[in-house]
Amino acid sequence: SQAVRQFLPTNGTSNFTDISADKQLLVESITAKGAAIRDRFQVLKGVMLPTSAGIFSPEESVKRIDVAYSFVQSLGLQLKADSLTGTQVKVNFNGQVITLDDNNEIPSNLRGYVQLALNLNLINAYFGLAQGPYDLTPTMKASFKPDQIVSRGDFAVIATRTFNEWTKALGK
């Protein structure tokens, strides 16, 4: 459901020093500028980010923050996400707007991606109640857990939710 253009460097080299030849097409394609089919002018960043310059880290686990970035990026929403850089990520719970307790754990440049992923219901926030010893009523709390590893089952749910957003745009 998250269409990605195929890409290989035309000079025959690889942009990454840690991938094998059999993985080069996939890694180069998902990290290339303009990777998302939704990026009609091929100017946006890839749908996955390298872990550092020239390093993809193919054996590294994927975290919730990575998934939020990738799925929002695959929908072609980079400019909207970038416009939210540095803002406090918030969620709505029964009409109450709650700022995430773990905002400081979300890199400033990725907060817009998390905000959009939450707004589009691609990925969920975690909710809980907190009550001090003298508080008459509990307070609703929310967090994102950006560094939590995503299981295959979690990934399947998020991919399915992303498909719904993809098809909405096709009907316009």
Region annotations inferred by a language model:
Residues S1-K172:
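N-terminal propeptides
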